């Protein structure tokens, strides 16, 4: 599991605004025909006429100048470094040929090698570890002068090249520290070589502006076109709000107060709209409250809304293994088997799936009728941490095939049955085996809860997510506990489309902006970066062009 476990806050503010439901009838949740059409009366709400504009928004490509010498190369043998912990040097060749006098074995995250190097110029360098691991896919943490720099994935059980590309280094003398990212996963380091890096390939950020749903609303198409336009040029700031308070949550208030800037993306969780939570005492207005917050953010503030759903398992399957009902989204807290519900072994379980999706559809229909596009991120973290193969939510616990079937079921139910057309589908399965296919996904997401003060770009996770499909798709840091340094990310190519910091302890401490996970200096750097978009810097998204190339050609 991630280094830090997020806390899901289950509390509805008594002061929250309740949105009245406008002309939306429940569909028959007992229906098993996902291709049929829902019998609903939809609200016909008009909006102001669109006058397309980009304003003075800059969409120039971002090319980072590299001042490193073109032919620079420096190799340091691992055994020449200072060893600590239980790190040991060996000259046995059971891992293949090595250079120098031997290589270093590291087994615990406290085992370290310190190496001294002098960098000739500020610039971008490739860092090649000739290394091996007991388990292919293990990682080596590379730090510089005590600060986390980058994670290098070791892909072989024999000594071979494992390159961390485009690492940003400053001129001067430095101490490079190497240690296993994960405890009890042995890694072996033969040498480390620094060479000048090539420029970032900008072609990877060219993404089609066609959504998976051909009937997507105009507002949704405009937002998605904006996202494709800024991908690789900016990272959009985001923050999850606690206590269903939306923009009035303490996170948003404190960020504005201390940083003078507001996150562009408001993160909301439909957890309390789960029918089993309402059956156990959550407010029946929970979904309406969330809808009101989303509408206010889009319509009145001009911001972007993302939604996840900590889907509480249906009532008969709760309180498993001594866990409370409100823990029902965790796989160990419920007896619900997704596989059995989908294969017909648990017919009642399947009907509950349809009931719950239909309940959430009521919230999404309100937003669709009110022209509010949503970055919709259901069934998040389905594969858990792929390194450990440990799905922690029930929707991933039955394996990849069941997860993909549920994703397609939900996509069909919301899109083709309920005709909800305001959703940009963000897949956050964490494991390529859980990927349902390009036709069901618009954006790829990954959730990262890094160690405290690890402001590295998490490029290994970015590359891992990007490689899920051969189709160029936007890659987003859909949840995070620690903010990454945008200078590092834009230099090494891990240009996450957005970040969305989780609420509570990852943002606040004693009702103030917290430095427990992200340092206060990094908070300030991120929210003042020219590469990070805040709410105040967003263009007019309601009037953003549907086709930017055509708009620019017609408005020279």
What is the predicted role of each segment?
Residues 25-32:
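Bacterial lipoprotein signal-peptidase II cleavage site
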Residues 473-556:
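Substrate-binding cleft of secreted/luminal carbohydrate-active enzymes
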Residues 377-379, 407-432, 473-482:
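Aromatic-lined carbohydrate-recognition surfaces of secreted/lumenal glycan-active proteins
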Residues 275-409, 420:
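Substrate-binding cleft of extracellular glycoside hydrolase catalytic domains
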Residues 50-220:
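Extracytoplasmic
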Residues 56-67, 195-271, 276, 280-284, ...:
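N-terminal module-boundary/linker segments of secreted carbohydrate-active enzymes
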Residues 20-23:
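C-terminal motif of bacterial Sec signal peptides marking the signal peptidase cleavage site
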Residues 431-454, 502:
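Aromatic- and acid-rich polysaccharide-binding/catalytic face
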């Amino acid at each position: 599991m991630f280094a830090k476990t997020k806390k899901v806050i289950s509390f509805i503010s008594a002061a929250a605004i309740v949105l009245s439901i406008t002309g939306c009838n429940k569909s028959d949740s007992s229906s098993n025909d996902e291709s049929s059409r829902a019998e609903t009366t939809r609200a016909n709400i008009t909006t102001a006429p669109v006058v397309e504009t980009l304003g003075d928004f800059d969409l120039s490509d971002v090319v980072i100048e590299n001042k490193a010498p073109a032919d620079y190369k420096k190799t340091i043998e691992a055994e020449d470094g200072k060893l600590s912990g239980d790190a040991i040097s060996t000259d046995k060749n059971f891992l293949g040929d090595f250079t120098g006098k031997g290589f270093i074995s590291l087994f615990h995250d406290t085992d370290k090698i310190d190496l001294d190097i002098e960098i000739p110029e500020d610039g971008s360098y490739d860092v090649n570890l000739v290394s091996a691991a007991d388990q292919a896919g293990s990682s080596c943490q590379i730090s510089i002068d005590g600060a986390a720099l980058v994670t290098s994935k070791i892909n072989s059980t024999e000594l071979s090249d494992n390159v961390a590309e485009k690492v940003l280094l400053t001129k001067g003398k430095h101490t490079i520290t190497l240690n296993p990212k994960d405890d009890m996963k042995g890694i072996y380091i033969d040498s480390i070589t620094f060479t000048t890096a090539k420029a970032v390939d900008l072609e990877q950020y060219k993404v089609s502006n066609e959504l998976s749903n051909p009937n997507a609303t105009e507002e949704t198409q405009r937002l998605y076109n904006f996202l494709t336009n800024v991908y690789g040029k900016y990272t959009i700031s985001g923050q999850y709000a606690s206590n269903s308070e939306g923009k009035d949550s303490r996170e948003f208030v404190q960020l504005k107060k201390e940083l003078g800037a507001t996150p562009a993306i408001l993160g909301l969780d439909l957890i309390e709209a789960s029918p089993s939570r309402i059956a156990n005492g959550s407010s029946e207005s929970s979904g309406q409250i969330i809808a009101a917050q989303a509408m206010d953010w889009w319509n009145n503030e001009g911001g972007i809304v993302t939604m996840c759903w900590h889907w509480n398992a249906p009532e008969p399957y709760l309180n498993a293994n001594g866990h409370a009902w409100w823990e029902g989204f965790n796989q160990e807290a419920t007896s619900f088997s997704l596989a059995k519900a989908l294969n017909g072994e648990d017919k009642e379980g399947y009907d509950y799936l349809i009931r719950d999706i239909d309940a959430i559809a009521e919230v999404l229909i309100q937003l669709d009728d009110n022209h509010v596009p949503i970055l919709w991120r259901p069934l998040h973290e389905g594969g858990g941490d792929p390194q450990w193969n440990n799905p922690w939510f029930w929707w991933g616990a039955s394996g990849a095939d069941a997860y993909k079937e549920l994703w397609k079921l939900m996509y069909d139910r919301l899109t083709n049955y309920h005709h909800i057309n305001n959703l940009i589908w963000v897949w956050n399965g964490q494991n390529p085996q859980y990927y349902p296919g390009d036709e069901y996904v618009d954006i790829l997401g990954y959730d990262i809860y890094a160690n405290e003060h690890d402001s590295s770009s998490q490029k290994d996770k970015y590359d891992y997510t990007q490689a899920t499909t051969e189709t160029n798709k936007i890659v987003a840091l859909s949840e995070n506990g620690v903010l990454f340094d945008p200078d590092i990310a834009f230099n090494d190519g891990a240009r996450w489309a957005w970040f969305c910091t989780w609420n509570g302890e990852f943002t606040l401490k004693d009702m103030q902006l917290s430095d427990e996970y992200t340092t206060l200096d990094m908070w300030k750097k991120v929210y003042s970066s020219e590469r990070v978009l805040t709410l105040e810097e967003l263009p007019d998204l309601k009037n953003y062009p549907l086709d930017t190339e055509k708009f620019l050609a017609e408005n020279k």
